[in-house]
Structures are given as C-alpha cells and as structure tokens.
A protein has these predicted regions:
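Glycine-rich, Lys/Arg-enriched anion-binding loops that position phosphate/diphosphate groups
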Residues: 120-155, 159-161, 165
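A conserved active-site cap/scaffold subdomain adjacent to cofactor or substrate pockets
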Residues: 63-135, 139
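Active-site-proximal loop->helix
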Residues: 1-10
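Short, ordered loop/turn segments at secondary-structure junctions
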Residues: 20, 45, 76-78, 104-106, ...
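Conserved NAD(P)+-binding/catalytic subdomain of aldehyde/semialdehyde dehydrogenases
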Residues: 9-98
Length: 269
C-alpha cells in the first residue's frame, strides 16, 4: 500500500505486480498484457542484474547494479558505534554486500570492530549482515589520508562516507574521483541518502563509479544531433570532409559532398 500511495502522489498511471528476471523479460519483449518498453531502470538481485545484461540492446538499461557497498573513511574522533552502524547499514542488504572501514588509527579500528560485533545480534536481518561482514567486511589502516585517496579511487565504492573533521572532509572531497554517492561529515549517515536527502540512491557498484553515475533524470532523456548546411557553409566545410572520406577509402561519402560542391541543382537554381 505504501508503494501504491507514493506512486499515486508521483503521478504514476501504470503498475505491474511482478519482479525478478521474468519481469525484465516481460518488459523487454512484451506479453499479451504488457507492452514492451524502451528502457528498464532500477536495481535488483543477481538474477535481475543478469537479465538486464541479456536484454541490453533490445532495450536500454541504466546500469548493472550489484550487491550494496559502503566505504567509510573515519578518524579516531568518531563514535565507534556510529561507524559500526554505517557499515552494517549496507551489510544487512545482502550476504554479498561489502562494508569497508578505512582509518588511520588502529585502536579506533579495533573499537569499531567490537561495536560491529555488539550490534550484529540486535539486527532484524542479523543473519544476512553477519554473513556479509564475515565474508566481505574489511578494515584497512592507512599511514596517512593520501593513501586513502588512492584506495577509494581504486575501489570506486557505491557509497563513500567521509567522517573526518570539516576541513579534512572537504579536502578529501576535492581529491576523490570515483564514488557513486558521497556522504560528508559524522552527521550524514548513508541511510539519509537512501530515504530523504534528495539524490537518487540507485548507484553504480562493482567499481562502476569509475565510468558511470547514479540514476538521474538524464537517464530518461536522449539527444539527437541536428545539422544544417547552406551552400556557403558546405563550401567551407565540404573540401576537408572530402579529403577525410577519401583517406578512409569511402568514395560514396566523398561523392555525396563533392557533387554538391561541383554541380548545381537545376530544380532549385
């Protein structure tokens, strides 16, 4: 009911109760009751991601979104329980989710690990979070924050939380290149971006932030190039285009231009 209410407020006029890889196939190819669409967006499990990969080309897709990820940069001035909760906020999504702490203080790292162990039994999805943390959770202690910049850009996390002082957070923000969404400061937990901050939280995973961005209105837009030459314009550009076409061995390309340069059109002249 909550999703239906939100859809009504947003002006959605068509809803299908379905999910999984079979829903992706139905949307891509159409059925007796579903008209095939042009583009499919949104995350899902491994089966949905695989299905989107298969139908790409028949329809457009936004991205191949995998299990959730978070990388937290935190110094010793943070509350270890807060940082532990940040890590577990992604671990509870999926047993394949990955939560990474990067800090410059070993004692603080141990405190966060202890806080994670304390919080895990209290979670509604504790079994999932425990499996995720045991398999893919990581704590990395760096000598300095310069090392952290390189790590972040190599990992290219879906979510990057920078829990440093204001000056260092801003400095880190200026240097980091690869992250799906960035959360600045100790009072900006990742879930605030999931639910209410504003930016879309459908984000690139599996290092996809190296070359792509989160879902936005731009994913629902496309562009067409519009080109018009008058006779003087073609006279200016045409000779160089002919040279390029001939260099490629595409004589029909060259002729389409040169005929217009060298012959008049009796129907318009």
């Amino acid at each position: 009911p909550l999703v239906l209410a939100a859809a009504h407020i947003a002006g959605v006029d068509e809803i299908y109760r379905m999910g999984g890889a079979q829903a992706i196939a139905a949307l891509a190819y159409g059925t007796a009751t579903i008209v095939a669409v042009d583009k499919i967006v949104g995350p899902g499990n491994a089966y949905v991601a695989t299905a989107k990969r298969h139908v790409f080309g028949t329809v457009g897709i936004d991205m191949i979104a995998g299990p959730s990820e978070i990388l937290v940069l935190a110094d010793k001035n943070n509350n270890p329980s807060w940082i532990a909760a940040d890590l577990l906020s992604q671990a509870e999504h999926d047993v394949a989710a990955q939560s990474i702490l990067v800090t410059d203080d070993e004692i603080f790292a141990d405190q966060v690990v202890a806080a994670v162990a304390e919080q895990l039994p209290t979670l509604a999805k504790g079994d999932i979070a425990t499996a995720s943390w045991d398999r893919y959770g990581s704590v990395i202690v760096v000598q300095n924050w310069d090392e952290a910049v390189d790590l972040v850009d190599r990992i290219a996390p879906e979510h990057l939380a920078i829990a440093l002082n204001d000056r260092d957070s801003e400095a880190m923000l200026e240097r980091v290149r690869n992250a799906g969404s960035i959360f600045l400061g100790a009072h900006t937990p990742e879930p605030i971006g999931d639910y209410i901050a504003g930016p879309n939280h459908v984000l690139p995973t599996a290092r996809g932030a190296r070359f792509s961005s989160g879902l936005s209105v731009l994913d629902f837009m496309k562009r067409s190039s519009i080109i018009r030459c008058d006779a003087p314009g073609l006279a200016h550009l045409g000779p160089d285009a002919v040279i390029l076409a001939e260099a490629e061995g595409l004589s029909a390309h060259a002729r389409a231009i040169s005929l217009r340069l060298n012959q008049s059109n009796p129907k318009t002249d």
